[in-house]
Amino acid sequence: MNRRRQRSLRRLKNQLKRIGILLALLIAVILMICGCLYIGEHLFKKDKQSDSKKDPDETNISGDVQPNPDQTVTDPVLDLETQILNTYNYQYAKPNASGIHIVLDAGHGGVDGGTQAGEILEKDVNLTITKKVQTLLEEAGATVTMTRETDDYVDLADRTRIGNQASANLFLSLHCNSYEDDSSITGLEVYYHKNSDISKQYAEAVTQALKDTQTIRIREASKQNMQVLRNSSNPAIMIEMGFLSNPEECANLTDPLYQEFISRMIVEKVISIL
């Protein structure tokens, strides 16, 4: 019995030793895990503190720039007026057109394409620029009546009727010129009818105002027997904005920035003489 009891006691002691070893190992593992968690949390806090001290414009890990909310971000694209100033040395001064009524006539339209340069039709250039002039005039406070606003054919009698019914301060017709015999001829030109002294006065005044900008070639005002000028009960002028037969002027007249430029120049100088 004593031997059996001794063996049992030895077995129990051995089992207790194993349990003790296992508990010690378990405690060691738990302590290691806790230590790792503590160290990780401590390092994370240090990283956050370090990040908070960095320049807000410093690049982050993904390569994105962190913006500073206190800084104003400037759009790299220049505004339209600055582009016009830089390209054509022309600074648009928005006029006060309050109380002024102008009839705008975009020459040709529909089946009447006007003059042509390759695939470029005068009627399209006329309408595009005329609508820009319309917008600028209305922004300046003017009342505007259009003889056409789409690619439609409006005969000359109807254009005159629309203008006369409007009782406007000015009937302004916009066209593009052409001279196929000599493609080197260039320049903007203002027409009037010989029977209207006030139209002549306006044409010459606009011509001089445009010349004063010293931006593009301006030809002398001239009298022409155009129906919309001849039959207008309002002062009436026609501006030939350039020659589509000249490659350089054709390129200009179809360039969106140039169209914005010439529209502003026409609006400012026409309003200045009314």
Please describe what each predicted stretch is:
Residues 173, 181, 222-274:
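Active-site-adjacent mobile loop/cap segments within catalytic or ligand-binding domains
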